[in-house]
Amino acid sequence: MKFRTAVLTISDSSSRGERPDLSGPAITQMLTPLSDIVWTGILPDDREQIAACLRRLADENQADLILTTGGTGLSPRDVTPEATLLIAEKMVPGIAEAMRAESMRITSRGMLSRGVAVVRGRSLIVNLPGSPKAVHECLSVILPALSHGIETLCGIARECAAQG
């Protein structure tokens, strides 16, 4: 199943045009063989704007998978996880745990990531880190399971037992 993906970059400087967005395009490049990229955008680190965008993308059934990049660290302006939790219906902690475990294998700073993964309606929303390198590392570890999760959300896959 080729799923529909929305990519939202969270960055004050990129939203003002002061710095190019490198992580959003990195996500798009990795997912293009597996997914139709149906929407991309850049927003500043603003909790309400992020939550409103995620809510709209999920509620209007625009994307099966919504990936954010940026705003998951400890900076006072990093609010992506909080915005995501504002609109969450279900938590999917294993995705964020897997990403942190992979990041910590590479650097102890991986434990400082606060990204979350949630479900709203029939959309799976995942917060990725802000650097292209970390995006690649995290997506590489979660991509094998994402298709099954999305198929389950969409009502295609019903069996969640281990398949190998």
What are these regions (language model features)?
Residues 1-164:
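Non-catalytic beta/alpha edge segments that cap or flank active sites
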